[in-house]
Each structure stands twice: as structure tokens, then as C-alpha cells.
């Protein structure tokens, strides 16, 4: 094809994964000096990728751009073309900017974190490979290329999670993750074949155009939608397939940050990229919403019982992933994208600063909490709800435009109520007023961003899912009741229990309700794993550390 100025953004996006994958082509050699040079190459390449993302955004804003296709090969059985295709729109630009930024921060942090580690060159090579393929996931314009890139990203993450191969618990958790990930890959491949056979093309733009032109989907496309949702559930560590996400904490902290701030969102990205097809099906998203709601409720409660910082962060990620799946299942695709961006940045910061969390907790003042009465709790929630409703009405949000708006406003109201209740439990009147002002400001900012993402990505993401209004009403009611129950249990509901029931609930939640153990036994029965392998050969010779302190 002829390269034109309108392809500038596509070329910039394509250069991002290309640079990272090229940096990883050279196999690491032995020697400390070579290891340091290798890590510097990957670090500066990640910085360059982020710079290219910013240039791509500028190019997209100031000139009319179109999708890029540099090469294609015909697939058998009329499945269409497997093309090196780059889709240029707001979604791919936002995701590419986010991934490249997080990757550059992690690469910079890893230089100090792994300084002196004999395997640091191998780590940076795996980081470049995984990051490069993940960038290809978020920018690809062809479903076949998208699927292959997701599979490659999964294999790269597997190698990173098992980086220290002499840690049996890490190997076991990584193996369990690989079982679910490979199953999701198979489901996504099957969906790709069904879509290609039915439509005759694997280009995302043509898939969307085909779906819009049809009054009803064929059985093959309905099956493909369900397969995509099941793949997203497995990729996103949804309940009851969440255990590996909690148990991979023995991986290096940069790997935890990469996974929890990026790669674990593969499931959400799958749904966002195929939102037109899933919205046309409608019912598959219903399953996604229910599974996400269950994961959110369990994860948010279990998180409060964890004593280890990284374990608490892992359960928090599981809960937030459930929240994201709930938003996608409700058809709030723009809101889910906003959530993905915000939580990815927060989680990267949380994991990379987890080492200083202990010092922060030691220096923090221990505040004596005053018990919150049932009346005070209900009053705070109602007042917060009224403020949220008023701000939403003032900013022009309407239930006619968003049928799920009552559920969204309930969630916002409960979040701001938690801020107020925290101030009421141990704060002075001045702190309570400050908390009230912060809650109002946060609500306004959130509603504003909500409107920006909903309207800004209206041409890129699907509209409301096509399903019976009664199902939407029932799903909204279940969502509101679940959020109210979880908030109540975290507040006065807990204190109304007897000490024996509180202790029993704590034990059950602390163990994740035990379901993961049954899933683990079943999974390992079909695919057992041997642990305790010797560590791989060192790629760099580093002098011994005389202090005896591990880097």
C-alpha cells in the first residue's frame, strides 16, 4: 500500500511495539557490564515508546488520520485476512499512551530494584517482549493479530511471573494462571474463527460495520460473543478463577506492578475492542456483569482481612477488576475505560511504593474510632445520595441517555459516604467539613469525567446493549442491593454481629471463602506441575554482596 500523511499516527503507533521487540531480539550475554548496558537499552526504548505515543496523540488531534495496513495474508476456509493492521481511534491512542507510560515507569524502577541481580538482563528482555506484544494488543486493527498478540503477551508474563524459578509457591501459582490463560486463548481463537467465517473479515472496523448493518446476529456470532465473554472472565481473574492473582506475590515487585497495572486488564480490553458485537448480543454481557459483581463483593470484603500489603493490593485488584467487568456488563463502556485508566495508574504507584508503606504506617498516628450508629450511617448515605443526584442533574445527566444511571449514582454516593463516615468516626468538626467539601468536589470531578468519557468515545465504543428492559431493571436492582449490602457490612452491620460471628466471618473471608482450593485441586488434576526446579543459568556475573542484604 502507499504510505500517506494520513497514516502518520498509525506508523507512530506501530513503531512503539516494534522498538521494544527489536530491543529484545539480541540475546543477553554474560557479564555485569553487558547486563547494565542491556537494561539501559530497554529503559530508553520504553521512554521512546511513550514519546511516540504522545506524538501519535498530537498527530491524531491535528490531522485527519486513517487506519494503517502494511501487509496481509489470506487465511483458509474464507476466514479473511491476517493483517499487520493498526486501528487509529481514541480508544487505541488512550490505551497505547497508558501502557507505554506505565511500562516506562516500571522499566525505570526496575533498574534500581534489580541492580546486582545476576538475572537482570533476562528480566529486561522479558519485560521488553511482554510490553511490546501488549502494546500490539491495544493498537491492532485485526482480530487475528489481536488474538496472537494476547497469546504472546500471556507467555511473556508467564516467564516473568516464574522469574525466580526456585520459588515453589510462585511456580505453582504461575502454573495455575497458565491453565486459565491457555483456556482463554483457546476460547478467543475459537471466537476469532467463528467471526472470520461468518463475516469474511477480521478487521475490527469491518466487524463493527457488519454488526451495525444486521437486524439480528447469526447463531455463530452469538456463540462468538459468549466465547469472548468467557475468555475475558478467565483473563481478568474473575471469581472463582482469581486465586493465581493473589498467589503470585513472590514475583519481583516490578512484575507485580506490570501485571496489576496493565496485563491483567487484557480481559477488559478484549471486551472494549469487541464492544459492538457484544452489545448486539446483550445476554453474554449479562453473565459478565453478574460474575463481575460477585468478584467485586467478595474481593472488597476479603481485602479488609489481609495483613500483608501486597496481598491486600492483590485482592483490591481482584475487586476492581470485578467492578470493571460489572461496568462492561452494564454497557457502561466509557465508564469502564475511565476506570481502567485511573486504576492502572493508581495500582502501578501502589505496588512500586509498597516497600515504603511499612515506614508510612509506622509514622502514622493511631486514631481512635468512634462507633457509627445505624441512624448516622443511613443519614450520611442519604445525604450523600442527594448531593450526588443534584450534581448529576446540574451537569445534565439523564436516565433517558443512560438507563443504568441510578446504579452509577448509587455507587458514587456510597463512595463519598465512606469518606464522610471515616471523618465522622475519628475527626473533629473541621475535618468533617473538609471531608464533606472533598466529597462534593470528588463527585463533581467524577461526574464530569464520566460525561467526558461517555461522549468522547461514543463513536468508538458501543451504545447500550440490546436486551430486554426487564433484564436491565433486574440487573440494576441486584447491583444496587449488592453495593448497599457490602457497604452496610463494612459499616454498622459488622458491629451488630456477635463477636463469635465476627470472628467466624473474618476467618472465612481471610481464606477467600476456600473456593480457590477446590478450583486449584480440579485444575491440577488435569494438568499437574512439578515444582522446586533449579534456577536458570545466570546471564550476568555480579560480585557477591558483602552486606548480605538482598537487592
From Swiss-Prot:
Record's subcellular location: Cell inner membrane
GO biological process: ATP synthesis coupled electron transport; electron transport coupled proton transport
Transmembrane segments: 6-26, 42-62, 65-85, 86-106, 132-152, 187-207, 217-237, 252-272, 284-304, 321-341, 374-394, 404-424, 434-454, 469-489
Known regulation of activity: Uptake of inorganic carbon by cells in the presence of thiosulphate is fully inhibited by the uncouplers carbonyl cyanide m-chlorophenyl hydrazone (CCCP), carbonyl cyanide p-trifluoromethoxyphenyl hydrazone (FCCP), S13 or SF6847. Not inhibited by the ATPase inhibitor N,N-dicyclohexylcarbodiimide (DCCD). Inorganic carbon uptake is inhibited by the ionophore carbonyl cyanide m-chlorophenyl hydrazone (CCCP), suggesting uptake is coupled to a cation gradient.
GO cellular component: plasma membrane
Entry annotated with the keyword Membrane: yes
Coarse class of the protein's main subcellular location: membrane
Mutant phenotype after disruption: Required for growth in ambient air.
Annotated Pfam families: Proton_antipo_M, Proton_antipo_N
Function, in words: Part of an energy-coupled inorganic carbon pump; its substrate may be carbon dioxide. Expression of both dabA2 and dabB2 (DAB2) restores growth in ambient air to E.coli deleted of its carbonic anhydrase genes (called CAfree, deletion of 'can' and 'cynT'); neither dabA2 or dabB2 alone is sufficient. Rescue is pH-independent, suggesting it transports CO(2) and not carbonate ions. Together the genes allow greater than normal uptake of inorganic carbon by E.coli. Uptake of carbon dioxide rather than bicarbonate has been suggested based on kinetic calculations.
Stated family: Belongs to the inorganic carbon transporter (TC 9.A.2) DabB family.
Self-association and partners: Forms a complex with DabA2, possibly a heterodimer.
Protein name: Probable inorganic carbon transporter subunit DabB2
Organism: Halothiobacillus neapolitanus (strain ATCC 23641 / c2)
Gene name as annotated: dabB2
Amino acid at each position: 500500500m502507499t504510505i500517506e500523511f494520513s497514516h502518520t499516527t498509525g506508523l507512530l503507533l506501530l513503531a512503539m511495539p516494534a522498538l521494544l521487540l527489536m530491543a529484545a531480539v539480541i540475546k543477553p550475554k554474560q557479564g555485569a557490564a553487558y547486563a547494565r548496558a542491556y537494561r539501559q537499552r530497554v529503559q530508553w526504548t520504553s521512554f521512546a515508546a511513550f514519546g511516540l505515543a504522545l506524538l501519535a496523540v498530537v498527530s491524531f488531534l491535528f490531522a485527519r488520520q486513517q487506519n494503517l495496513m502494511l501487509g496481509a495474508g489470506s487465511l483458509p476456509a474464507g476466514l479473511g485476512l491476517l493483517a499487520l493492521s493498526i486501528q487509529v481511534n481514541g480508544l487505541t491512542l488512550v490505551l497505547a499512551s497508558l501502557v507505554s507510560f506505565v511500562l516506562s515507569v516500571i522499566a525505570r524502577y526496575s533498574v534500581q530494584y534489580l541492580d546486582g541481580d545476576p538475572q537482570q538482563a533476562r528480566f529486561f528482555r522479558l519485560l521488553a517482549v511482554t510490553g511490546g506484544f501488549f502494546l500490539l494488543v491495544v493498537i491492532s486493527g485485526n482480530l487475528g493479530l489481536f488474538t496472537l498478540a494476547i497469546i504472546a503477551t500471556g507467555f511473556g508474563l508467564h516467564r516473568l511471573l516464574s522469574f525466580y524459578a526456585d520459588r515453589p509457591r510462585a511456580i505453582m501459582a504461575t502454573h495455575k494462571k497458565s491453565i486459565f490463560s491457555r483456556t482463554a486463548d483457546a476460547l478467543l481463537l475459537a471466537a476469532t474463527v467463528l467471526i472470520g467465517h461468518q463475516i469474511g473479515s477480521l478487521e475490527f472496523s469491518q466487524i463493527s460495520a457488519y454488526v451495525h448493518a444486521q437486524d439480528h446476529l447469526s447463531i455463530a456470532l452469538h456463540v462468538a460473543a459468549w466465547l469472548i465473554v468467557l475468555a475475558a472472565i478467565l483473563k481478568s481473574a474473575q471469581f472463582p478463577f482469581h486465586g493465581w492473582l493473589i498467589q503470585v506475590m513472590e514475583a519481583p515487585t516490578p512484575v507485580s506492578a506490570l501485571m496489576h497495572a496493565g496485563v491483567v486488564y487484557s480481559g477488559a480490553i478484549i471486551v472494549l475492542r469487541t464492544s459492538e458485537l457484544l452489545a448486539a448480543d446483550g445476554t453474554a454481557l449479562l453473565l459478565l456483569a453478574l460474575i463481575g459483581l460477585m468478584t467485586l463483593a467478595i474481593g472488597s470484603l476479603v481485602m479488609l482481612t489481609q495483613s500483608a500489603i501486597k496481598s491486600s493490593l492483590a485482592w483490591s485488584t481482584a475487586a476492581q477488576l470485578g467492578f470493571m467487568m460489572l461496568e462492561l456488563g452494564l454497557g457502561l463502556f466509557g465508564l469502564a475505560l475511565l476506570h481502567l485508566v485511573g486504576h492502572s495508574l493508581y495500582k502501578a504507584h501502589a505496588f512500586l511504593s509498597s516497600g515504603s508503606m511499612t515506614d508510612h504506617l509506622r509514622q502514622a498516628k493511631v486514631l481512635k474510632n468512634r462507633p457509627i450508629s445505624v441512624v448516622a450511617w443511613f443519614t450520611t448515605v442519604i445525604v450523600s445520595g442527594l448531593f450526588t443526584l443534584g450534581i448529576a442533574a446540574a451537569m445534565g445527566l439523564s436516565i433517558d441517555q443512560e438507563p443504568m444511571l441510578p446504579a452509577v449514582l448509587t455507587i458514587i454516593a456510597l463512595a463519598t459516604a465512606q469518606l464522610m463516615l471515616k471523618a465522622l468516626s475519628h475527626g473533629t468538626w473541621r475535618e468533617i467539613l473538609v471531608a464533606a467539601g472533598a466529597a462534593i468536589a470528588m463527585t463533581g470531578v467524577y461526574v464530569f469525567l464520566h460525561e467526558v468519557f461517555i461522549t468522547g468515545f461514543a463513536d468508538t465504543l458501543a451504545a447500550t446493549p440490546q436486551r430486554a428492559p426487564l433484564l436491565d431493571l433486574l440487573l440494576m436492582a441486584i447491583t444496587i442491593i449488592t453495593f448497599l449490602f457490602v457497604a452496610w457490612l463494612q459499616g454498622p452491620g459488622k458491629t451488630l454481629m456477635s463477636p463469635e460471628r465476627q470472628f467466624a466471618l473474618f476467618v472465612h473471608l481471610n481464606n477467600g471463602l476456600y473456593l480457590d482450593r477446590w478450583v486449584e485441586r480440579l485444575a491440577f488434576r488435569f494438568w499437574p506441575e512439578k515444582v522446586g526446579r533449579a534456577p536458570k543459568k545466570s546471564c550476568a556475573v555480579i560480585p557477591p554482596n558483602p552486606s548480605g542484604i538482598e537487592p
